[in-house]
């Protein structure tokens, strides 16, 4: 009978650690890397590069989009930091959990139970906080997507050859070209006529087509950004669903852990399974924290 109790306890405890580890591993390998933030950083810089290529109305929308993308990134990394903090707690507690197997007794078993419940409880709390941050991040992406639709409409109007913005750009080009022609004349009035004729040919044959191409490049950039933002929002929504499933699983195993008797006679295989699960989660935490800048890894107890 004692052996059956021990096996049941091992199964519950091992499941508790593995469930928490699974949630962290999911965050580490999927949720935390779902958005290509390096690409987004470059994109945000690109927003400023085109600031001379759209109207004031479009400029306001671009400013709003930039703020929303930066807000989304802030909230996403806020979620990352929350999980980082959980890792810091987990490595310390699981190390203590492993060491408590030495000269095992009922008091140490009770301490182990408290440790696992603390890890699971803190996990639910921290992952829920991360979930809220991801929700806000997703909302900012969604709002940015709406602004990008409005921007596309604005740019379509601006870049129409009949628009006041397009005509103002053409007028600027003409003014600069004719000013250059006048400054370069050396052959009197007839030279001026010839220079203006050349300037007119350059304007209509080269400069205006170049303007059209340049403005098309700007619109294509924002069309591409719109698709990227929509995909990012979709990916975060999928990430939130996965995380919600993991949080629910931790909550369920926490309830089972709370009602499990911990003080049983473990054989060597059982001890190996439990220590192995704990060490694996410590390594997962180390991997996560290292990827987020921690230089010194937590040393896994060699027992």
Swiss-Prot record:
This is Hemolysin E. The keyword Hydrolase does not apply. Disulfide bonds join 87-285. One of its GO terms (biological process) is symbiont-mediated hemolysis of host erythrocyte. It holds the Pfam family HlyE. Keywords: Cytolysis, Disulfide bond, Hemolysis, Host cell membrane, Host membrane, Membrane, Periplasm, Secreted, Toxin, Transmembrane, Transmembrane helix, Virulence. It is found in: Secreted; Periplasm; Host cell membrane. Belongs to the hemolysin E family. It comes from Salmonella typhi. It is a single-pass membrane protein. The keyword Transmembrane applies. Toxin, which has some hemolytic activity towards mammalian cells. Acts by forming a pore-like structure upon contact with mammalian cells. CDD domains: HlyE-like. InterPro entries: Hemolysin_E (IPR027018). The chain crosses the membrane at residues 179-199. GO terms for cellular component: extracellular region; host cell plasma membrane; membrane; periplasmic space. In periplasm, it forms a disulfide bond, which prevents the oligomerization. In outer membrane vesicles, the redox status prevents formation of the disulfide bond, leading to oligomerization and pore formation. One of its GO terms (molecular function) is pore-forming activity. SUPFAM superfamilies: Bacterial hemolysins. Monomer and oligomer. In periplasm, it is present as a monomer, while in outer membrane vesicles, it oligomerizes to form a pore structure that is active. The pore is formed by a dodecamer.
